[in-house]
Structure formats: structure tokens, C-alpha cells
Swiss-Prot record:
UniProt name for this protein: Peptide chain release factor 1
Modified residues (N5-methylglutamine): Q238
Superkingdom to which the source organism belongs: Bacteria
InterPro entries: PCRF (IPR005139), Pep_chain_release_fac_I (IPR000352), Pep_chain_release_fac_I_sf (IPR045853), Prokaryotic/Mito_RF (IPR050057), RF-1 (IPR004373)
Function: Peptide chain release factor 1 directs the termination of translation in response to the peptide chain termination codons UAG and UAA.
Organism of derivation: Psychrobacter sp. (strain PRwf-1)
UniProt PTM comment: Methylated by PrmC. Methylation increases the termination efficiency of RF1.
Keywords assigned by UniProt, alphabetized: Cytoplasm, Methylation, Protein biosynthesis
Family stated for the protein in its record: Belongs to the prokaryotic/mitochondrial release factor family.
């Protein structure tokens, strides 16, 4: 292990002890925000420091076994000590790899809720139907994770599915799990309306954006935001409102638009549309930085650009292929039912490998 990493881990142990003491301080306990922030930091540090302590103990065990094997004359004793050395070496290697991953830079947005947008692209009715299939897939996955999905806006297709559906997903680590879903999703299958049995290709675009706290963003000039109201039909065309409760917000300098029509209250719709507008403006800024400076995300996991084709769902072959990491899974039925864990884990591992490669090299 690099000396620089050992030094950082020792510093984290010191910080863990400091945070532990602070959590018992009456001033901290009386400050809810400070107590919550320190509790989160304590939780993250406890996992790393515990693993670091096990790593150091394994090093001690290996060293002790090596000294015993050097002094031993009995062949059976030497064999037993060698087995301990081999076991400790395997443990050390595995723990070092885990520590390297845990020490990678964290995306501060990983734990926040996210806005999930799905839009039908090329393919007409079939694209809209597939948008509905994708939304159902994410709904099933969200349910398996204990998350909540709230539909903010929906424009249904004429033959099912959605021309566009926008939702808010809340729960633990939502953005961190879904952030690599942004891009173009292509489907190859025989539409129900196809009498000749020919396979058609259509596509949908997915965008995943972190929900940004309004207090954490640059202030928007109210004069730069235009609000339009209109009557909402709600999801599925039901509960038609007789008042203009739906809200569309436009940020004039950037042209970014957000709308919400699911609440009966115009005030609630405006608040949710404002959250979405801020998230979109923030995402546009991030994308601009990616386009100009950050080559890392564009390597394997991708830029998150909606126009970038990231995945193909081939129904005749029962396969899903993610083109960014050359991963093909022959379990399409399960995937469409929300079984995304294997896929999302693979994307995160690839991203971690990218990060490790980008910061590798340094001192030994």
C-alpha cells in the first residue's frame, strides 16, 4: 500500500475520534443541523476506520506468522504457519482493494433524490409504448429499493405508454444508483401492430438529474423566470381541473423549461416545477463542464448526454447490451421487471475503475 494512502487513513482515524467526541458535546447535540451532519460523517468514517484497523491487524498477523516460520524446525508447524501467511495475504489484498474504492472521491449528489425524465424518440407509437415500459422498469426497481416515485408530469401516447413522463424519485442513494441511466435507450422488437412479424427499431431518451437544494444554488433572478399556467388533465387523462393549476416555468436567459401538473394546488405545482427548473439549470452547467474539461465520464460510463446511445434492448434475442461497458445480459424479461442490480453494479464498478486509473500513478 502507498505511504500516502496510509497517511490519509491514519488522518481519518484521528478525524473519526474527533467526530465521536463532538457528537457527545452538548453544543453539538443542541444544534440539529450540526448533529445531523456530524452523524453522517461519523457513519462514513466508522466503516473506513474499522476496515483500516482490520487491515493493520492482518499485517501484524502475517508478520508474526513469518517470524514463527523462520524460527520453527517442525515441518508441520511451518506448513501451518505458511497457511496463515497465505490467508493473511489474501485478506490484505482484498481489503486494500476495498480501501482504495472507499477512498475514491465521492459525488456529493449521490445520496440525494433525482428527477427521472423519459421521452419517446424515433419510432412513433412504438417509442411511446417503450417509454412506458422503461418507466415501469424503473418503478419496479425503485420499489425493490424501498424508494418512492412521484409523477410530476405525463403526456400519454395515443396507443399507450408516454410521449414524455417526468417523475421524482426519493430514497437512499437514488442519484448515485441511477445517474448512469442518462442517454438514448434503443429497443428492437416486433410491435403488436406489425402484421408481417418484422423487427422494428425505436428509441427513447432518459435523463436523470439530482435534486438540488435551492439554498445551495446560485440565486435566480425572479425577473428571469416566466410562469405560465394551464389546465391539467393529470396522469391518465383523469381528474380534469377546471382551474389553471398546472404550472410551466421558463428560465429566460437559458431557455430551460420545467412544468408540473400533478397537484391540484397551483402553489404546490409551482414549488415542484421550481425544484425541477433549478435541477435542469444545474445539470446544464455540469454538462458544460463535462463537455469542456472532464474526459473521465466520457470514457467508459459516458457523458450522460441524452443523444448518446448507451443501451439496446433486443427482445427477439432476449438480451440487453450496454454499449459503454460492452456488457450483454441474456435476462431481458427480468430486467424489464426491474432487475437492474447486476447492470447498475457493473456500471458503478467501471466508473470506480475509471476514477482509480485517473488518480493512479503517484508515490509508492
Amino acid at each position: 500500500m502507498k505511504d500516502s494512502l496510509r497517511e490519509r487513513l491514519d488522518q481519518m482515524v484521528d478525524r473519526f475520534e474527533e467526530v465521536t467526541a463532538l457528537l457527545s458535546d452538548p453544543d453539538t447535540i443542541s444544534d440539529n443541523n450540526k448533529f445531523r451532519e456530524l452523524s453522517m460523517e461519523h457513519s462514513e468514517l466508522s466503516e473506513i476506520t474499522a476496515l483500516w484497523q482490520r487491515y493493520r491487524q492482518a499485517e501484524i498477523d502475517k508478520k508474526d506468522a513469518q517470524e514463527m516460520i523462520n524460527d520453527a524446525s517442525d515441518p508441520d508447524m511451518k506448513e501451518m504457519m505458511q497457511e496463515e501467511i497465505d490467508s493473511a495475504s489474501r485478506d490484505i489484498e482484498a481489503m486494500e482493494e476495498e480501501l482504495n474504492v472507499m477512498m475514491l472521491p465521492k459525488d456529493p449528489n449521490d445520496k440525494v433524490p433525482a428527477f427521472l425524465e423519459i421521452r419517446a424518440g424515433t419510432g412513433g407509437d412504438e417509442a411511446a409504448i417503450f417509454s412506458g415500459d422503461l418507466f415501469r422498469m424503473y418503478e419496479r426497481y425503485a420499489s425493490s429499493q424501498g424508494w418512492t416515485i412521484e409523477v410530476l408530469s405525463a403526456n400519454e401516447g395515443e396507443h399507450g405508454g408516454y410521449k414524455e413522463i417526468i417523475s421524482r424519485v426519493s430514497g437512499n442513494d437514488v442519484y448515485g444508483r441511477l445517474k448512469f441511466e442518462s442517454g438514448a435507450h434503443r429497443v428492437q422488437r416486433v410491435p403488436e401492430t406489425e402484421s408481417q412479424g418484422r423487427v422494428h427499431t425505436s428509441a427513447c431518451t432518459v435523463a436523470v438529474m439530482p435534486e438540488v437544494e435551492i439554498d445551495d444554488t446560485v440565486e435566480l433572478n425572479p425577473a428571469d423566470i416566466r410562469m405560465d399556467t394551464f389546465r391539467s388533465s393529470g396522469a391518465g387523462g383523469q381528474h380534469v381541473n377546471t382551474t389553471d393549476s398546472a404550472v410551466r416555468l421558463t428560465h429566460i436567459p437559458t431557455g430551460v423549461v420545467a412544468e408540473c401538473q400533478q397537484e391540484r394546488s397551483q402553489h404546490k405545482n409551482r414549488a415542484k416545477a421550481m425544484q425541477m427548473l433549478i435541477a435542469r439549470i444545474q445539470q446544464a452547467k455540469v454538462q458544460e463542464q463535462v463537455d469542456t474539461a472532464d474526459a473521465l465520464r466520457r470514457n467508459l460510463v459516458g457523458s450522460g448526454d441524452r443523444s448518446e446511445r448507451i443501451r439496446t434492448y433486443n427482445f427477439p434475442q432476449g438480451r440487453m447490451t450496454d454499449h459503454r461497458i460492452n456488457l450483454t445480459l441474456y435476462k431481458l424479461d427480468a430486467i424489464m421487471e426491474g432487475d437492474l442490480t447486476e447492470l447498475l453494479d457493473a456500471l458503478n464498478r467501471e466508473h470506480q475503475a475509471d476514477l482509480m486509473a485517473s488518480i493512479g500513478g503517484g508515490d509508492d
